[in-house]
């Protein structure tokens, strides 16, 4: 069995690394030289976007060092509140993971929306394309334990679960499971979305859930519709698919220097065109 990584790390080395940099007016767009260091941790669901943005930002600002970790939303929020990282990435508002006094000191930067999809092993996908909301809840709470009970083959259901620190789990629990806690499967528990997909792909009868960006160009697993509605950006925008949330990048107080420049870049029109390409949603397109 593969090692289940609870954090995924990407280090983008600096050509030259300074200390604190002067605040940038709109990231690299101001034309001022940006130097310094940016550290982030948290949501594995947001990590692909953060890594992509960091690579593009780095190409424009070679003297900035960026160290990017996953580890789960709870971890990211805890670390940014403690000051051990500059940015804490989260799938849920800070108030849902931190005590009120700690959450109060954080500044929320909403960067995009994230759709979450239930995924299944391909050996189940031929017969099971969609589950009702009730069936999905019964599967993840272990009230249903065999796929034949929901129209699939005679195959035990294997849950691939996430730890309680996971923001993706918190969102899925609230919106897909109507607040019911999923049954635990410690032997296949991970908050690394890439590892979770591998586990579902390699385990007969497996089911789990991931953010939509992890399914872009991925044929190893199949996404389930809920009540006949597929987990797509279009269905998220028009309000028919309900399992989605805003992605947050928190700072302890207002950001300055390289951290501000990096966040300004992610929120810029220049980078905005890249968001949908990766499977994330543009907040302004959400149906009011």
What are the roles of these predicted feature ranges?
Residues 12-16:
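C-terminal motif of bacterial Sec signal peptides marking the signal peptidase cleavage site
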């Amino acid at each position: 069995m593969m090692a289940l990584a609870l954090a995924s790390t990407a280090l983008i080395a600096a050509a030259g690394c300074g200390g604190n940099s002067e605040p940038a007016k709109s990231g690299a767009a101001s034309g001022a030289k940006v130097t310094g260091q940016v550290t982030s941790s948290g949501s594995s669901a947001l990590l692909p976007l953060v890594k992509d943005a960091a690579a593009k930002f780095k190409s424009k600002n070679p003297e900035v060092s960026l160290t990017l970790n996953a580890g789960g939303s709870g971890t990211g929020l805890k670390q940014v509140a403690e000051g051990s990282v500059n940015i804490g990435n989260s799938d849920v508002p800070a108030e849902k993971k931190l005590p009120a006094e700690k959450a109060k000191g954080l500044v929320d930067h909403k960067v995009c929306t994230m759709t979450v999809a239930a995924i299944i092993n391909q050996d189940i996908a031929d017969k099971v394309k969609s589950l009702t909301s009730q069936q999905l809840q019964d599967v993840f709470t272990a009230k249903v334990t065999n796929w034949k009970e929901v129209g699939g083959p005679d195959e035990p259901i294997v849950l691939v679960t996430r730890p309680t620190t996971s923001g993706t789990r918190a969102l899925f629990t609230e919106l897909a499971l109507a607040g019911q806690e999923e049954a635990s499967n410690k032997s296949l528990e991970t908050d690394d979305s890439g590892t979770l997909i591998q586990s579902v792909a390699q385990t007969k009868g497996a089911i789990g859930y991931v953010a939509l960006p992890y399914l872009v160009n991925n044929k190893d697993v199949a996404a389930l519709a809920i009540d006949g509605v597929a987990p797509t950006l279009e269905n998220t925008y028009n309000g028919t698919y309900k399992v989605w949330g805003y992605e947050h990048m928190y700072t302890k107080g207002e950001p300055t220097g390289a951290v501000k420049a990096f966040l300004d870049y992610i929120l810029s029109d220049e980078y905005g065109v890249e968001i949908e390409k990766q499977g994330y949603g543009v907040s302004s397109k959400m149906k009011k």
